[in-house]
Amino acid sequence: MEMKPKYDPREVEKGRYEEWVSNGYFKPSEDKSKEAYTIVIPPPNVTGKLHLGHAWDTTLQDIITRMKRMQGYDTLYLPGMDHAGIATQAKVEAKLNEQGISRHDLGREKFLQQAWDWKEEYATFIRQQWAKLGLGLDYSRERFTLDDGLSKAVRKVFVDLYNKGIIYRGERIINWDPKARTALSDIEVIHEDVQGAFYHFKYPYADGNGYIEIATTRPETMLGDTAIVVNPNDERYKDVIGKTVILPIVGRELPILADEYVDIEFGSGAMKVTPAHDPNDFEIGQRHQLENIIVMDEYGKMNDKADKYKGMDRFDCRNQLVKDLKEQDLVIKIEEHTHSVGHSERSGAIVEPYLSTQWFVKMKPLAQRALDNQNTKDRIDFFPGRFENTFNRWMEEIRDWTISRQLWWGHQIPAWYHKDTGEVFVGEEAPEDIENWIQDEDVLDTWFSSALWPFSTLGWPDTNADDFKRYYPTNALVTGYDIIFFWVARMIFQGLEFTDRRPFNDVLLHGLVRAEDGRKMSKSLGNGVDPMDVIDEYGADSLRYFLATGSSPGHDLRYSTEKVESVWNFINKIWNAARFSLMNIGEDFKVEDIDLSGNLSLADQWILTRLNETISTVTELSDKYEFGEVGRALYNFIWDEFCDWYIEMSKIPMNGEDESQKQTTRSVLSYVLDKIMKMLHPFMPFVTETIWQSLPHHGETIVKANWPTVDQALIFNESKQTMEQLVEIIKSVRQSRVEVNTPLSKAIPILIQTKDEKIKHTLMDNISYLHKFCNPSQLTIDTEIEIPEKAMTTVVVAGKVVLPLEGLIDMDKEIARLEKELDKLQSELDRVDKKLSNENFVNKAPEKIINEEKEKQQHYQEKYNGVKSRIEQLKA
């Protein structure tokens, strides 16, 4: 197959993915003699199109599974999507609201049909994006969290945990979204610093002797106060414990109680307790058997318990209440105060801690098992390892999980209430006399079904399902470090509880994709990047390679168009090297013609040695998920060694008369390029398939080609050492030419003084490389040479490289030129130094600008030192 003259990603990628899918290349072989390898995709939400974070996440998964497929594993990369309860419902409701329709106008059944329509529309977009990224997914196994099979798994888990007493229904403080009117999980609450106030109020003692000072940021909740607590070790309040105060406005008598929760140093050291509107207060209330008084309704408006404030919005109530307290001279002071306030991720509403009857999971027994498992041979390995400590800490500090949501889109809770007796029935199927029962209207938290993802997607609860037996446990989970607790931990404890095995062997955690300046990408900042736009401009291979190699595990990634463009340049370099090679290999050269047993040149032996070292490095680093290091190893070998050196060196035999030497060079070019394509394939699937199809090869597709392995017979360490010496000499000559302003096209005398006879003979044996790359008018190589008085000498491993300067340059003129350049560099250094010593600039300028100036400073300093050194050398 002929390669086009220019690399065009659109041309290269067009139709290729459809070809892979239609030929079934991504389906597991199901060959029982092979070891199975499985990754299930972290299911994207069907709320919208995929962002750069998804592209990063799935690219890493695809790299791993493509590599494992090539290494001979029976590989399954399973696709799927998440119904994303509150997020999708909010999107569908917003769409309906544009038409002036609410979900209640439609009713549950019709609303759910709208949600399913939304799901189908966005699932199509997501599949199109997966295709553009080139993900090797087996679509015949695609799953959705509301599929029948997964719904069955959800019901079984709920019922089993309920029967074990781990799931229960009760009153607890939950995150309440008054706009969406539903409970929220902790991950659906975004904490933002808000400018508010600390209100200091007087709570008069019931006996009329003074008051106790209470501070709060939420005055509206004081209407639900049921006690005051102080620390029993606080000397200020020892005499008032057991007394009572009068709750302002309401007039209710509140006891003063002792509780060690209170921080003596914070505020006045006395704290109001509102058990129905604060999680910590609720715990205190439980310890002291306090009444729970709810003062708001589900809309965030004050209810009957709020007396004259009934019907007011909670924040309007706050303002009015403070005004009324001022009139009663009960306000001591109001301080400005910045504090963290929870907002609903979906609706943006300020979240209200709210006492509500919900369904909960007791987390302690499940978390303990997950912790204990980390001390067994079945432990899960975290990459980077530091995240295991994060996981353990969260498991140790875990609280019960609110799993019910006041939504329609999701898994409806499999609990029914008897119409007459109120009896609760929990079962995988509805009661037989269904006419006497009403099903709980709430649905389960999205994370409840997501927690079952690694095994529910493979056929569980049918433990005899072929896929479950073959592909579970999965091998690796790749996801962001921000959801270790919300998703990773839950999959671990549910996997252990219901399958008695870890759900995955490894957890590879990456960070967040940030803008170039380090800020988080967001719609409000307008700095988001659509991965599909990047692919349209630079191709999927460029984006994939950048995402995979741009950071190390566990770290954030700064998106940079410049860096994506540099990957495009790298691919273009590979394309041109492949075209050159193919032109020299010739159309008639077949894979059977590859013969490395002939007379290999020094360059051949060197590149084959470096190829084997690179194969070893890439394989080893990939097993540790160190793809940033893999990227560097591949780039250095391909760009610096294969393209810049070997391709150029191969021109010597290819332009010569020795046919057998030409044939050997063709073999080496073909062999090395084949291995390069295979190593690059997981990162750059499209361009490598195109180039590989043009090379002499066996097999239908590179997707199923064998991963390269080290061939000890093709490692020539002595030749590698010799080539390193030659390359150092050539680089030294070229650098010296630059320093004395002499182009490579001008032939000049070159002297090489070697350390010993062996090196001398080695260099003499390979003198053709020195002639080609140094362009000497006269080349002297010896252990003893007379170094001219005026000469430029560089020390290298092999000895010394000397360039006589007599007649080469006008010394005085060159020194004058360099001194002028030195003055310019000094001016630039002074300017940068002045800028960086300016406190105003350093404190106010963006980090990116400061770093740019520091880089300039380093660059100018290095150039200054180099020019100064050249002047001194010339003067000497």
Curated annotation (Swiss-Prot):
It catalyses: tRNA(Val) + L-valine + ATP = L-valyl-tRNA(Val) + AMP + diphosphate. GO terms for molecular function: aminoacyl-tRNA deacylase activity; ATP binding; valine-tRNA ligase activity. GO terms for cellular component: cytosol. It comes from the Bacteria. Keywords: Aminoacyl-tRNA synthetase, ATP-binding, Coiled coil, Cytoplasm, Ligase, Nucleotide-binding, Protein biosynthesis. A motif ('HIGH' region) lies at residues 44-54. Disulfide bonds: none annotated. GO terms for biological process: valyl-tRNA aminoacylation. ATP binds at K523. Its EC number is 6.1.1.9. Residues 805-876 form a coiled coil. PROSITE patterns: AA_TRNA_LIGASE_I. CDD domains: Anticodon_Ia_Val (cd07962), ValRS_core (cd00817). It is found in: Cytoplasm. The keyword Protein biosynthesis applies. A motif ('KMSKS' region) lies at residues 520-524. Belongs to the class-I aminoacyl-tRNA synthetase family. ValS type 1 subfamily. Catalyzes the attachment of valine to tRNA(Val). As ValRS can inadvertently accommodate and process structurally similar amino acids such as threonine, to avoid such errors, it has a 'posttransfer' editing activity that hydrolyzes mischarged Thr-tRNA(Val) in a tRNA-dependent manner. This is Valine--tRNA ligase.
